[in-house]
């Protein structure tokens, strides 16, 4: 970092979709326009979506070419949680065989299953060339009316999620990828979906400490590499989205919870931010 110029340092803070660099078309290969954009904007990471994925051979080639043509090693990421949020395995299958459903459906089967599911996901991602997964979901489905998290969560019970998340973290690592706890400080008790507007958390800070933070603390202690901070507004702490809040990001996540890894925002294209 000491040898980087200001432009490089700013670009390194950006995690983008390929289409943020190539505005004219969906990216499925490293064409001239994409290659030039990577050189001009040395971003820190690139996240692929389903539209960027066609075949096993195509995906491996795309990821390798992106990495080979970046002067600074890229984080290459995807949303691969299992179940409904699956960009790679839903399209290309599981190289280890079988299907992996929503994590919530395995909640009564113990930590070894949470580990094995995460390991298989990691196996698949690292096979193609990804080095980071935006998973596991550390939110707890505590509000039955919550639709944005739902069965993406490992449990609807705080203590149970806190038991399972460390197994998942270790499983992803065993599969060869870094992992991300999301969506801090907890999106499972909201009524609203932050994809489509402001989502509010009405719990007090003490409530969060005793409830939502359990699974995040457990994941951090297990060695999670990234924490994704969501756009939820915690009314007891701040009147702005959590990922813009010093109280949430610096005072609580970095200082109180002691997380020293990479902190990343949720997508800045979501309506809770763009509106």
Listing of model-derived features with the role each one plays in the protein:
Residues 99-130, 135-169, 173:
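A substrate-binding/cap region within the structured catalytic cores of diverse enzymes
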Residues 38-39, 126, 220, 255:
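Non-catalytic positions within long, well-ordered alpha-helices that form the structural scaffold/packing
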Residues 5, 23-33, 52-67, 74, ...:
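Second-shell residues forming the walls of enzyme active-site clefts
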Residues 36-50:
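A short aromatic-anchored loop/beta-hairpin motif
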Residues 80-84, 140-143:
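Acidic helix-start/capping segments at beta-turn-to-alpha-helix junctions
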Residues 1-21, 39:
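Mature N-terminal segment immediately following signal peptide/propeptide cleavage
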Residues 11-18, 44-48, 74-80, 132-136, ...:
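Hydrophobic faces of well-ordered beta-strands that scaffold small-molecule active sites
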Residues 53-75, 82, 108-129:
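Active-site-adjacent structural elements in enzyme catalytic domains
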């Amino acid at each position: 970092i000491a040898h980087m110029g200001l432009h490089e340092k700013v670009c390194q803070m950006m995690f983008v979709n390929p289409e943020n660099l190539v505005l004219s078309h969906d990216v499925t290969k490293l064409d001239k326009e994409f290659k030039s954009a990577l050189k001009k904007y040395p971003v820190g990471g690139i996240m692929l979506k389903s539209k960027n994925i066609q075949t096993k051979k195509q995906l491996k080639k795309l990821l390798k070419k992106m990495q080979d043509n970046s002067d600074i090693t890229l984080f290459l990421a995807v949303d691969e949680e299992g179940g409904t949020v699956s960009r790679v395995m839903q399209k290309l299958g599981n190289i280890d065989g079988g299907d992996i459903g929503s994590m919530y459906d395995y909640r009564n089967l113990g930590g070894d299953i949470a580990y094995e599911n995460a390991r298989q996901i990691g196996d698949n991602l690292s096979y193609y060339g990804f080095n980071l997964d935006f998973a596991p979901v550390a939110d707890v489905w505590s509000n039955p009316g919550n639709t944005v998290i739902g069965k993406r969560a490992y449990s609807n019970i705080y203590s149970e999620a806190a038991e399972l998340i460390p197994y998942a973290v270790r499983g992803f690592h065993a599969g060869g990828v870094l992992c991300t706890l999301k969506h801090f400080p907890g999106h499972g008790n909201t009524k609203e979906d932050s994809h489509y507007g402001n989502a509010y958390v009405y719990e007090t800070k003490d409530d969060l400490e005793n409830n939502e933070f359990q699974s995040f603390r457990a994941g951090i202690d297990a060695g999670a590499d990234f924490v994704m901070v969501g756009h939820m507004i915690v009314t007891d702490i701040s009147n702005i989205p959590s990922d813009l809040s010093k109280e949430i990001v610096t005072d609580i996540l970095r200082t109180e919870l002691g997380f020293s890894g990479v902190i990343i925002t949720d997508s800045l294209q979501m309506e809770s931010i763009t509106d």
